[in-house]
Amino acid sequence: MYRQLVNILTALFAFFLGTNHFREAFCKDHDSRSGKHPSQTLSPSDFLDKLMGRTSGYDARIRPNFKGPPVNVTCNIFINSFGSVTETTMDYRVNIFLRQQWNDSRLAYSEYPDDSLDLDPSMLDSIWKPDLFFANEKGANFHDVTTDNKLLRISKNGKVLYSIRLTLTLSCPMDLKNFPMDVQTCTMQLESFGYTMNDLIFEWLSDGPVQVAEGLTLPQFILKEEKELGYCTKHYNTGKFTCIEVKFHLERQMGYYLIQMYIPSLLIVILSWVSFWINMDAAPARVALGITTVLTMTTQSSGSRASLPKVSYVKAIDIWMAVCLLFVFAALLEYAAVNFVSRQHKEFLRLRRRQKRQNKEEDVTRESRFNFSGYGMGHCLQMKDGTAVKATPANPLPQPPKDADAIKKKFVDRAKRIDTISRAAFPLAFLIFNIFYWITYKIIRHEDVHKK
């Protein structure tokens, strides 16, 4: 009985021992096939080498899904700052974070415990990246203070996030017909350079494709909240290329132009009206005031165009400056008319004296002919001593007419009436112009722009 019990225990011990040997042998065989050693995990360096190193078989020159469906790249941008908008060169400057996301199944992993890996920017050269460029870019630069402003993140499922900080100068064709009450639309176009739509497609991120930093302000514009997102697919001789775009609406603020252009020109026009209250005999004062205001207005008009491109159409500021210059010049011409009318009495009296002199000479000649022609003496007169002399009509200088003062007063009153009418007509005409001007550009055309 005792011996049977010992045999049973020995058999059980041998069975368990054989099972353990088999398990260890199986684990070793499995680990050797998978390239792992028992009780050993990969280091980060070994893992990256295995994932995208030379021994991994990963080729950064070949896109994901090679010879398969195109790679979908979702993009979004975060605007850090919106720089100067320049009318002369028609461009704007912007600082952004550009983020691109795509899926590369070759970078999927399960051997590493982390759900995602934030890698050094130097690893960007080891993976495939979309060949994105900005179609309307005029200048750009990367940022490397204190290190390269780039981010590379790879998720377990092979999703890649590539973020980079850029400062861009982008072209922005502007319509300045309503300047400085205009609303400009500036675009940003993201396009593939070498991959056609058979290989690569850009799309906007569905959640927050374009984000703006809080408190972002521009010196002369208000950045509208509504932004238009769309596609701008390009067709070239080399193929059809994917392109996406965003349109920014910038409404110009008038504060600067009111202070620097509109108010000074308005005051110059009002100053030109002061001559209507100056005595018409003070010619030096009125002429000097008129010429000064004309020259000042000309300088002001030239200054308003200095910061603008030489376009072929008329801008709103051009109309304002032209009308102001017209009013100032008209005020100078008004004094010329006043001075001319006030001096007309002298010419009138001179002509009147000439006419009277001619009439008197004709009367004397006619009278002398009548008195002496009957005696056959013609124009000769016989004196008491018997001598004959030729009768010559008297030609005394005419005396000024008795109503000369009345005539002078009549013309002076006409000149004064011109000044009196101008004092009311000029401000009224300028007021009517202002009403039409501001209604047209601030209400009618402004609404048309917003409808578009």
UniProtKB/Swiss-Prot annotation:
UniProtKB keywords: Cell membrane, Cell projection, Chloride, Chloride channel, Disulfide bond, Glycoprotein, Ion channel, Ion transport, Ligand-gated ion channel, Membrane, Metal-binding, Postsynaptic cell membrane, Receptor, Signal, Synapse, Transmembrane, Transmembrane helix, Transport, Zinc
Residues that carry a glycan: 72, 103
Signal peptide as annotated in the record: 1-27
Record site: Important for obstruction of the ion pore in the closed conformation: 295
Tissues showing expression: Detected in the retina inner plexiform layer (at protein level). Detected in neonate retina. Detected in brain. Detected in spinal cord, with higher levels in the dorsal horn.
Extracellular side: 28-256, 305-315, 442-452
Protein residues bound to glycine 1: 99, 163, 238
One GO cellular component term noted in the UniProt record for this chain: cell projection
Positions with a binding annotation for Zn(2+): 226, 228, 249
MF-aspect GO terms: extracellularly glycine-gated chloride channel activity; glycine binding; glycine-gated chloride ion channel activity; metal ion binding; transmembrane signaling receptor activity; transmitter-gated monoatomic ion channel activity involved in regulation of postsynaptic membrane potential
Record entry for activity regulation: Channel opening is triggered by extracellular glycine. Channel opening is also triggered by taurine and beta-alanine. Inhibited by strychnine. Inhibited by picrotoxin.
Subunit note: Interacts with GLRB. Heteropentamer composed of GLRA2 and GLRB; functional GLRB-GLRA2 heteropentamers contain four GLRA2 subunits and one GLRB subunit, although alternative subunit composition cannot be excluded. Homopentamer (in vitro). Both homopentamers and heteropentamers form functional ion channels, but their characteristics are subtly different.
Comment field (misc): The alpha subunit binds strychnine.
Protein name: Glycine receptor subunit alpha-2
Source organism of the structure: Mus musculus
